[in-house]
Curated annotation (Swiss-Prot):
The active site is at C295, H379, E381. The gene is cpa1. This is Carbamoyl phosphate synthase arginine-specific small chain. It comes from Neosartorya fischeri (strain ATCC 1020 / DSM 3700 / CBS 544.65 / FGSC A1164 / JCM 1740 / NRRL 181 / WB 181) (Aspergillus fischerianus). Its EC number is 6.3.5.5. Residues 219-406 form the Glutamine amidotransferase type-1 domain. It is found in: Mitochondrion matrix.
């Protein structure tokens, strides 16, 4: 009996091998058919090299600032990060798209679980190779399908190492992606410089909205310059109910209704946000409220304090950048995405550097010497990326709670005080957590919820 079984095994193995080979052949034929169906695309750097490849996104032409990221994972988060607004993102990772694109599922707070904003923010995508067959339990579509649906052109089959080498040596440059067209050297007007555009105005919420914590212990005002969903989640998950305001909202006029103020990340040149800088300066002059800023928020806080910002040659965009905590001597691996930095030598005497970049010695944070105000250039919320510095949110929330306790004698009913809105409420906001409600309605909603419970 066993002899017959063992004798039959080679034949069965041979048949199984034949079936596997047939399946593999059909799979590869499908891949080749999909690849050959792609239209020609060109990635052109202004006054620089031209790269030819295949289009796998939207059939449209786009121009912007070409920048690169060395992040190995997290392309859904990177591409939906509002800080990439107006930029053509070049990935150094050789293969992108292998785990597809997840759904727009939301968590218990009503925040997006897998994206940093509802839309794809990058102007264009450049990769060496794109995975057309994806596999992940959260995936609902391919990277190419997502780019096409969002109207974002994407190109594959180009030498990204050569592109990054050029950008590293020459600096971030204007570039464009053209689909199905030849490059015309005389059409320089086709290059659009996003630095000349007020990008923050495009990505900031148009009206205030509120996100409640499950067990609210404090109330934080968030200045939205292009805030990432995981920043909001990092605050709410620590017991902070938040009200998110447009970037140009006069926050100093309503700060007395809040226990803390947070300044978010965002795209572009910080000097474009003059209204925000002015309001922050007035806030620090008129209030002792704790303040925390991240990325662009760090730069805006520095400008409000009287420091200057500089444009970096090619920026820092990665998930593995070392930043040294100057107060403890500890080194953190950080996630970063910025093209500007604070000139630490211009900090006023009542401020001091908090973190420093160990790669290029650029400033990575600052802290006030006597007040609960600090900021970081890197992203402590880091999705995707390392969480070495996520404790900074704990430090901030602790200072917010202490401030709230210190104000209890002066404002015993702080949580129920209405706060007048100084802008018209619109029906649609960037994050879309819930229908926009005025601050004057938040207390009523909270009272109704408590009565129902």
């Amino acid at each position: 009996m066993f002899a017959r079984v063992f004798k039959a095994m080679p034949a069965r193995a041979s048949a199984l091998t034949s079936v596997n080979a047939s399946i593999q052949a059909r799979f590869m034929a499908t891949v080749r058919q999909q690849r050959t169906a792609h239209e020609r695309a060109t990635f052109t750097i202004r006054d620089g090299p031209i790269f030819h490849g295949k289009s796998f996104g939207a059939r449209t032409n786009i121009s912007g600032e070409a920048v690169f990221t060395t992040s190995l994972v997290g392309y859904p988060e990177s591409l939906t990060d509002p800080s990439y607004r107006g930029q053509i993102l070049v990935f150094t990772q050789p293969l992108i798209g292998n785990y597809g694109v997840p759904s727009a599922e939301r968590d218990q707070h009503g925040l997006l679980k897998y994206f940093e904003s509802p839309n794809l923010q990058a102007a264009g995508v450049v990769v060496a190779d794109v995975a057309e067959q994806y596999s992940h339990w959260t995936a609902v579509e391919s990277l190419g399908e997502w780019c096409a649906r969002e109207g974002v052109p994407a190109i594959s089959g180009v030498d990204t190492r050569a592109i990054v080498t050029y950008l590293r040596e020459q600096g971030s440059s204007l570039a464009r992606i053209t689909v199905g067209e030849e490059y015309d050297a005389d059409q320089d007007e086709a290059f659009t410089d996003p630095e000349q555009i007020h990008l923050v105005r495009q990505v900031s919420t148009k009206a205030p909205f509120h996100v409640s914590a499950a067990d609210p212990q404090c109330h934080v005002a968030v200045i939205d310059c292009g805030v990432k969903e995981n920043i909001l989640r990092s605050l709410v998950s620590r017991g902070a109910s938040i009200t998110v305001f447009p970037f140009d909202y006069p926050i100093h006029k309503v700060a007395h209704h809040f226990d803390g103020v947070f300044i978010s990340n965002g795209p572009g040149d910080p000097t474009h946000c003059q209204e925000t800088t002015y309001h922050l300066r007035r806030l620090m002059e008129t209030s002792q409220v704790p303040i925390f800023g991240i990325c662009l928020g760090h730069q805006l806080l520095a400008l409000a304090a009287g420091a200057r910002t500089i444009k970096l040659k090619y920026g820092n965009r990665a998930h593995n950048i070392p930043a040294l905590d100057l107060s403890t001597g500890r080194c953190h691996i950080t996630s970063q995405n910025h093209g500007y930095a604070v000139d630490a030598s211009t900090l006023p005497s009542d401020w001091k550097p908090y973190f420093v970049n160990l790669n290029d010695s650029s400033n990575e944070g600052m802290i006030h010497k006597s007040r609960p105000i600090f900021s970081t250039q890197f992203h402590p919320e880091a999705k995707g990326g390392p969480l070495d510095s996520s404790y900074l949110f704990d430090i901030y929330i602790d200072s917010v709670k202490k401030y709230k306790a210190s104000q209890a004698a002066f404002h015993p009913q702080r949580d129920s005080l209405p706060s007048p809105l100084l802008v018209d409420l619109l029906a649609k906001e960037r994050v879309g957590v819930q229908p926009t409600i005025g601050m004057q309605n938040i207390a009523a909603a909270a009272t109704a919820a408590a009565a129902a419970a």
